[in-house]
From Swiss-Prot:
Coiled coil: none annotated. The gene is potA. It is a peripheral membrane protein. This is Spermidine/putrescine import ATP-binding protein PotA. GO terms for cellular component: ATP-binding cassette (ABC) transporter complex.
Amino acid sequence: MKNIEKSEIIISLVDVDKEFGDKKVLDQINLDIKRGDFVTLLGPSGSGKTTILRLIGGFEWTTRGEIKFNGIDIKDVPAHKRDTATIFQDYALFPHLSVRGNIEFGLKLKRIKKKAEEIPDVVWKKFEHLKKKWQDKQKRKIKELKILQAHLEKLLENPQLDIKKRKKLQDKLDDSDFRYSNWENYLTSKSESFKKKYLTRKITKQEINKEITDIIDLVGLTGNENRAISELSGGMKQRVALARSLVIEPEIVLLDEPLSALDTKIRQKMQVFLKKIQQKLGLTFIFVTHDQDEALQLSDKIAIIRNGKIAQYDEPKQIYDYPVNKWVANFIGDSNFFQAKYIKKNQVEILGLKLYTIHDEFIPGQKLDCLIRPEDIDIDLNSGYFKGKVIQNIYKGSYYSLDIKVENTIINVETNDFYDLETQVFLKWDDDAIHLMEMENAEI
């Protein structure tokens, strides 16, 4: 897949469903990933984030929908033909090979473009002749499939169809969609096979040695080339797995919770290292994790996955500051939630007090969820919006986490200052600290 014309959007998932038997694990997934971005799929266990990664990598097939690589649907393309490399949670290193042996493994299959002067004119003429035949066949097959799909879609519009008949027709339509994807890739696949045979050569031993030396230096493994995998720490194994993936020069690196087995300090170092490598090489990284802090620190964009759907897809700061709903807000960080009532433009009522808000998009009288992050609340001993007392004080290393009781409401506050239990305090915040969200099934 290396010779497809490049576009800004490198991967696009369009209306992707995935079913395992009668269970739907992904439901209408739509996701565009830009070339060179570090994108994290974040969600709780069982949300579907790893399934999305496996679909992109070709380890699972979609039930329906499209997975586009540079604009072409590749859902029927097997994993080994996709321009991706995958780093698994357990690294999947070969225990019988050394560090060098693991990295070298993929290189042995790599081929190098021949110089133009090394290719006879007759080869180019043959390629152009075959390319025309492939194009004609591709157009004919795609036209046939479009006619078939239109016919099946027309039949499915009949409301009188019983469940069994409808499922049979839907299965035929899904199958035709896979065949359509196959023929959409036909010209590219045939062209690449021809180029591999006639326009490339095997990589030489000297070239292999240079590439291994370069990648080992890049990932910081110099001096460890001949060590056995069993002798390495978790962090070093991770570097070997990364080197093995990068040395084959993929366009996309898929990472399935690769840091989850590491202890905290090594994990933090590897987070910095991964981001540095990704930025240096300009590759697209798609990273799966359930760790919110990890996602916020590493990502250019985060897709929050919940129950097989994308709850929100945006830049980390936008998701943290402007979550689309209460669930996302609670999942992505510590939160204080209040029931709020929108009074009028730029005015909201919280805990019986009317306050200024930067929000102006809601309807007067509308009931809303209100989010205020603990770190956005200030403590004052003399004045503020609400008066309360400290009922819990927990030292977190770089700050104190306080629970403040305001009438019947507990408000969590993060502060650098220590306050004794039972201390009377006032709480206040900046206008933009209030984030209002629509309530599910809210009444006006």
